[in-house]
Swiss-Prot record:
Statement: the UniProt record of this protein carries the keyword Cytoplasm: no
Similarity comment text for this entry: Belongs to the bacterial ribosomal protein bL31 family. Type B subfamily.
Annotated keywords: Ribonucleoprotein, Ribosomal protein
Subunit details: Part of the 50S ribosomal subunit.
GO molecular function, one term: structural constituent of ribosome
GO BP field: translation
Keyword Ribosomal protein found: yes
Protein's UniProt name: Large ribosomal subunit protein bL31B-1
Entries under PROSITE patterns matching the protein: RIBOSOMAL_L31 (PS01143)
One GO cellular component term: ribosome
Domain of life per record: Bacteria
Amino acid sequence: MQQDKHPDYRPVVFRDRGAGYAFLTRSTATSDQTIVWDDGETYPVVEVEISSESHPFYTGKARTVDSEGRVARFERRYGAGEGQDTGEAG
């Protein structure tokens, strides 16, 4: 088996900037920043913008898109087939 072929897979802390939430997992991600975790060990920390603690889908604050309402508004605005040429002769 070849050495140095695969990236280093080690424990890493991911920290959500907005929610202040951090979790320890294993990853190949690298970082110069470190953090002392609850177990007293020092791990590299990777800052993320969105995690399960701040994403609207997981927090229950998701917006549902009313696609039927959008179609109805389009048809009101541009007409629902009124006066359109169907391409039939005669």
